A protein has these predicted regions:
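N-terminal Rossmann-fold NAD(P) dinucleotide-binding loop
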Residues: 233-234
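C-terminal substrate-binding/catalytic core of Rossmann-like NAD(P)-dependent dehydrogenases/reductases
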Residues: 282, 287-296, 300, 339-391, ...
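Glycine-rich beta-strand-centered segment in the early N-terminal region that forms part
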Residues: 22-39, 54-115, 147, 191-193
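Adenosine-nucleotide cofactor-binding segment
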Residues: 223-229, 241-314
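NAD(P)H dinucleotide-binding glycine-rich loop of Rossmann-like/cofactor-binding domains
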Residues: 58-60, 98-227
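Helix-to-beta-strand junctions that scaffold the AdoMet/dcAdoMet cofactor pocket
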Residues: 323-324
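C-terminal capping/lid region of NAD(P)-dependent oxidoreductase domains
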Residues: 1-3, 296, 300, 330, ...
Length: 421
């Protein structure tokens, strides 16, 4: 119903509501109980609440669920298998529920998790493993591959429900609450000199870091264009600069405060959609042509790499039109069902279209590390204007006001809205 009325997103007609649940107990030795300090509201949360997201991901979640996956907290309790954090430590949470979190022995992990790319875990649509259960992976004939080994299990009394992330999971609460639990592999210590309002951005900033490192953007001759004015777009601008990209960087945003943020984070040029964007493209050497029917098209010039951090029809159409021949388009926005998208120049310019999701194992400075570790280190050493991204913080009980600010960001001026228990 959110498609038809904003009241169904943040008003009394919304299906969201406050509930009282018992304090979460640790389900195993490798688990951590966390008191939530701040939790961001993500665009994917708004898309799901309003039912404007594609239903294609529905099998990879389980409901009812406590939302929230951009989590900053303080450790309250650790199991005996946890040695890298202690009660009192500030931590951020990787929300992905990969094979190890779901209770499987290493020999049973899916190929993505074996490679450290757990954001594409191939078993997130399956139940987890109570101790001693057979693995759910099936062979080509549909038979359970029993030789995959038993699960190490969780003490839930039943299998862990399907679901890709904390925040969209029936059994593991997200950060829109006072406390939550997470597996030790999901928990990362925050440096002492990173303030809370910056640390809570670790998850969305890591998406930008992951996209920059995986796409080869640091080797691009440029120019690079970043489209979008949300946390992921700003995180991508910051990631490009803090990780070492020195070429020309153009950022497209809509409102004055967003344009200022993009410049403060490292954009050489900031543009708004429409005439300014067109002129920026022409300045690269592109030539404009007008077909008999349809919008203006371009040849020559263009951007070597376009980061689309929106993922809708206008942004994808612009990305295809603005990319140079044999250029690359990286989609970091949660693109879903796109209607009336003309793909002519995808093939006519031999473009590469690549999507990235989440975070995982990265090659950085000669080491293999988690994206969160890269992001946290750079946040400590190069915070730039990151403190300006969290524009609104609401007490948890004012969640309706928080959702209104995030959903109607054009009026509120919100970039990132966070809840504080």
């Amino acid at each position: 119903l959110g498609r038809f009325s904003d009241a169904c997103v943040y008003g009394r007609a919304s299906r969201l509501g406050r509930v009282v649940r018992p304090r979460p107990e640790l389900p195993g030795d490798d688990w951590v109980r966390v008191e939530v300090l701040l939790c961001g509201i993500c665009g994917s949360d708004l898309g799901n609440v309003s039912y404007k997201s594609s239903p294609a991901m529905e099998p990879f979640g389980s409901f009812p669920a406590i939302l929230g996956h951009e989590i900053l907290g303080r450790v309250a309790e650790v199991g005996p298998g946890v040695v890298h954090v202690a009660p009192g430590d500030r931590v951020v949470i990787d929300p992905m529920l990969h094979c190890e979190v779901r209770g499987w022995e290493e020999k049973a992990w899916c190929p993505s998790c074996v490679a450290g790319l757990h954001s594409t875990c191939e078993l997130s649509g399956e139940e987890g493993a109570p101790a001693g259960d057979a693995h759910p992976m099936r062979d080509a004939d549909g038979h359970v591959a029993a030789d995959r080994g038993p699960g190490v299990g969780l003490e839930l009394g039943r299998p862990l429900a399907p679901g890709l992330t904390i925040g969209y999971h029936r059994d593991l609460a997200g950060g829109w609450g006072e406390e939550m639990i997470a597996h030790r592999r999901q928990v990362f210590t925050v440096p002492h000199d990173v303030p809370d309002r910056v640390a809570v951005l670790t998850e969305p900033l890591s998406i930008g870091v992951h996209g920059v490192l995986r796409s080869g953007a640091l080797r691009s001759p440029g120019p690079i264009l970043v489209i979008g004015s949300g946390a992921i777009a700003f995180g991508t601008i910051w990631a490009l600069r803090t990780l070492g990209y020195e070429g020309r960087l153009v950022a497209q945003a809509k409102r004055p405060h967003e344009v200022e943020l993009a410049a403060a984070l490292g954009a050489d040029e900031t543009i708004t959609p429409g005439d300014e964007a067109r002129q920026a493209l022409i300045d690269t050497g592109a030539r404009a042509y007008m077909p008999v029917v349809g919008p203006e098209v371009y040849a020559g010039g263009g951007f070597d790499l376009v980061f689309d951090c929106v993922g809708n029809q206008p942004s994808l159409a612009q990305s295809i039109g603005f990319a140079t021949a044999r250029g690359q388009i990286v989609v970091l926005g949660c693109a879903g069902q796109i209607r009336k998208l003309d793909l002519t120049f995808l093939w006519a310019k031999e473009l590469r279209l690549q999507g990235y999701v989440g975070y995982g194992a990265e090659e950085w400075e000669g080491r293999r590390v988690h994206t969160f570790e890269v992001a946290l280190a750079r946040m400590r050493d190069d915070p730039r204007a990151l403190g300006g991204l969290v524009t609104h913080v609401y007490p948890l009980e004012q969640y309706r006001d928080a959702l209104r600010s995030a959903y109607d960001h054009r009026r509120s001026g919100a970039v990132k809205v966070a809840l504080q228990p």
